[in-house]
C-alpha cells in the first residue's frame, strides 16, 4: 500500500557531484530534499523509485548513480560517493540514480525498489506497474522522478512550443487537485512532441494511487533552462 509519494525532476543539475558545492538552482534542490525527507518520515517498509528509461525493468537496489554517465571525470566536488554498500553502475537509468542520490542526501535508508518504465509505455501498462508497486510491501513510499516539457522557451533543449504551457499546467492541476486519474488521460503523442519525458512516470503514480484520496503540496514549479520542473509531496488520507 502506498502511504506517501513525492514527485521530483530527474535533473542532473540536482546532483552535487556534478555541479559542485553551490546548487545551480538552490530552491529546486532544497524542495526535492524536503519532499524526500517527508517520505522517510512516513516510516515506510520500502521506498520505490520510479523513472523513465529505454525499457521497463526492476534494477539492483544496491546500484548507485555513476557520475561518469554524464561526462568522464564529471565528479567535480570531492565526496564519499557512492555511499558504503552501493556500487556506481553505468547501466542504471539516470532518473533512478538521481532519485537514489536524493534519498542518500536525505539519509533515507529504508529498503529500496528501483523501477524503470519505458518511455513509450502505454497508460494502462503504466497504471499496472503502479498497482504492482503499491502491493509490493505493506507500507510503500513512492518517489517519482519526472520532467515536464523541455520546450518552454526559445533557449530550451527543444526550442519553444506554445503548447507546452497548457500541457504542463494540466499535469500540475492534476497533482494539486489530487485528481491523479487525470494523468492517465495525458496524450502520449503530444507529450513526446513536447519532450515531456515524465509522462509514463506520472501515469505510474496515478496507477499506484488509483482510488485513494490524496492531498498535495507543490513545493516548486518553474522552468529553468526551458524545462518544466515540479516538486510535490502527496499525502494519502
Placement of each model-derived feature along the sequence:
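A short aromatic-anchored loop/beta-hairpin motif
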Residues: 1-90
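Conserved active-site and cofactor/substrate-binding residues in soluble primary-metabolism enzymes
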Residues: 23-30, 93, 97, 166, ...
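Short, hydrophobic/amphipathic alpha-helical packing segments
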Residues: 28-37, 123-130, 202
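Cap/lid and interdomain-hinge subdomains that line or gate substrate/regulatory clefts
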Residues: 80-129
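Active-site beta-strand/loop microenvironment that shapes enzyme catalytic pockets
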Residues: 119-170
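Polyanion-binding loop/helix "lid" in catalytic or ligand-binding cores
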Residues: 175-221
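Short, basic/aromatic-enriched C-terminal tail that caps enzymatic domains
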Residues: 225-237
Amino acid at each position: 500500500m502506498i502511504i506517501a509519494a513525492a514527485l521530483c525532476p530527474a535533473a542532473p543539475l540536482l546532483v552535487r557531484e556534478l555541479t559542485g558545492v553551490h546548487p545551480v538552482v538552490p530552491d529546486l534542490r532544497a524542495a526535492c530534499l524536503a519532499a524526500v525527507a517527508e517520505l522517510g518520515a512516513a516510516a515506510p517498509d520500502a521506498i520505490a523509485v520510479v523513472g523513465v528509461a529505454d525499457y521497463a525493468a526492476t534494477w539492483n537496489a544496491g546500484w548507485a548513480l555513476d557520475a561518469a554517465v554524464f561526462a568522464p571525470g564529471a565528479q567535480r566536488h570531492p565526496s564519499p560517493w557512492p555511499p558504503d554498500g552501493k556500487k556506481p553502475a553505468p547501466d542504471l537509468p539516470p532518473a533512478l540514480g538521481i532519485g537514489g542520490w536524493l534519498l542518500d542526501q536525505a539519509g533515507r535508508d529504508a529498503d529500496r525498489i528501483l523501477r524503470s518504465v519505458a518511455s513509450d509505455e502505454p497508460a494502462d501498462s503504466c497504471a499496472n506497474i503502479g498497482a504492482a508497486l503499491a502491493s509490493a510491501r505493506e507500507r510503500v513510499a513512492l518517489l517519482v522522478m519526472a520532467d515536464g516539457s523541455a520546450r518552454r522557451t526559445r533557449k530550451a533543449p527543444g526550442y519553444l512550443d506554445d503548447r507546452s504551457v497548457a500541457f504542463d499546467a494540466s499535469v500540475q492541476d492534476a497533482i494539486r487537485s489530487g485528481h491523479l486519474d487525470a494523468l492517465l488521460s495525458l496524450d502520449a503523442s503530444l507529450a513526446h512532441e513536447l519532450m515531456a519525458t515524465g509522462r509514463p512516470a506520472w501515469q505510474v503514480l496515478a496507477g499506484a494511487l488509483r482510488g485513494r484520496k490524496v492531498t498535495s503540496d507543490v513545493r516548486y514549479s518553474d522552468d529553468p533552462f526551458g524545462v518544466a520542473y515540479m516538486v510535490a509531496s502527496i499525502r494519502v488520507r
